[in-house]
C-alpha cells in the first residue's frame, strides 16, 4: 500500500513516525505555535483560545491517526506533519464525537462549533473542486516557536515532496495566513485560488503541488 511506502521513505530520510504517546507533546507545541493564527482567532470569536486550539488538535490527532500519516522531524518533536490519503473528505461525525468533539461544543459554545463545521465543509468542497479528492492532503505543518527559522519545515517537507515527484502524485494544502504563501511556493506549491472563509475576512489559499 502507498501509505506504507511513504512511511518507509520518510523513515529512510531520517524522519520520525509519531506514536500516540507523542500526542500530548504535539498538542502543547501546537497551542503555542498557532497563537494568533487568523483561522483559529476566527473560530473562537475574535480572540485566540489556546485551550480550545489544543483540544481541536487533540481531536484531529486521534481522528486522523489510523488513516493518515503523522510524522515529525525527530523524537525531539520540533515540528510535525499530518498527511491524509486520497479520498479524504473530512472528519467523520462518529470519530469527531468519540475523540472529544463534545468538549469543543460544551466549552466553546455552539457558535464556535458551527464555525468549525461550516469551515470544514467549505474547505473540503474547495479541495474536491481542484483535486477530485485524488490528492494527498497536507492537513497540517506545524513547527514549534522555539525551532522556527532552523529549517525544520524543510526537513519535514523535502523528503515527502521528493516522493511525490518520483511517483507523480499531487499534494494539496490550504493556508489562512498570508506570510505562509511564499514559504509553500518555495517548496513548489502553486496558488489555485485565493478567497475568504465565508462570513469572515480570513484569507483562504488553496494550493497544489502537482507532479502528474
Predicted regions and their residues:
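Conserved GNAT acetyl-CoA-binding A-motif
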Residues: 134-136, 163-176
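Conserved active-site alpha-helix within GNAT-family acetyltransferase domains
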Residues: 154, 166-168, 177-194
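Conserved beta-strand-loop-alpha-helix junction that forms the acyl-donor binding cleft
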Residues: 139-148, 172-182, 196-202, 209-211
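Conserved acyl-donor/pantetheine-binding loop and adjacent beta-alpha core of acyl/acetyltransferases
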Residues: 80-142, 198
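A short beta-loop-alpha structural element at the N-terminal edge
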Residues: 14-28, 36
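Active-site rim helix/loop that mediates acceptor-substrate recognition in acyltransferases
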Residues: 47-69
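Conserved beta-hairpin
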Residues: 66-84
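Conserved acetyl-CoA-binding loop-helix of GNAT-fold acetyltransferases
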Residues: 143, 149-162
Amino acid at each position: 500500500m502507498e501509505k506504507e511506502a511513504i512511511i518507509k521513505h520518510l523513515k529512510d530520510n531520517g524522519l520520525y513516525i509519531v506514536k500516540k504517546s507523542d500526542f500530548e507533546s504535539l498538542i502543547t507545541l501546537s497551542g503555542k505555535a498557532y497563537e494568533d493564527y487568523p483561522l483559529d482567532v476566527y473560530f473562537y470569536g475574535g480572540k485566540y483560545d489556546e485551550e480550545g486550539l489544543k483540544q481541536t488538535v487533540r481531536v484531529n490527532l486521534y481522528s486522523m491517526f489510523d488513516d493518515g500519516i503523522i510524522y515529525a522531524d525527530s523524537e525531539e518533536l520540533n515540528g510535525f506533519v499530518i498527511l491524509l490519503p486520497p479520498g479524504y473528505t473530512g472528519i467523520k461525525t462518529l470519530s469527531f464525537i468519540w475523540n472529544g468533539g463534545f468538549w469543543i461544543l460544551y466549552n466553546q459554545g455552539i457558535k464556535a462549533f458551527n464555525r468549525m463545521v461550516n469551515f470544514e465543509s467549505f474547505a473540503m468542497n474547495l479541495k474536491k473542486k481542484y483535486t477530485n479528492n485524488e490528492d494527498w492532503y497536507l492537513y497540517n505543518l506545524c513547527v514549534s516557536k522555539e525551532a522556527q527559522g532552523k529549517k525544520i519545515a524543510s526537513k519535514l517537507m523535502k523528503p515527502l515532496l521528493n516522493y511525490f515527484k518520483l511517483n507523480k502524485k499531487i499534494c494539496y494544502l490550504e493556508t489562512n495566513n498570508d506570510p505562509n504563501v511564499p514559504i509553500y511556493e518555495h517548496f513548489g506549491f502553486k496558488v489555485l485560488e485565493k478567497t475568504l472563509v465565508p462570513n469572515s475576512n480570513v484569507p483562504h489559499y488553496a494550493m497544489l503541488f502537482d507532479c502528474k
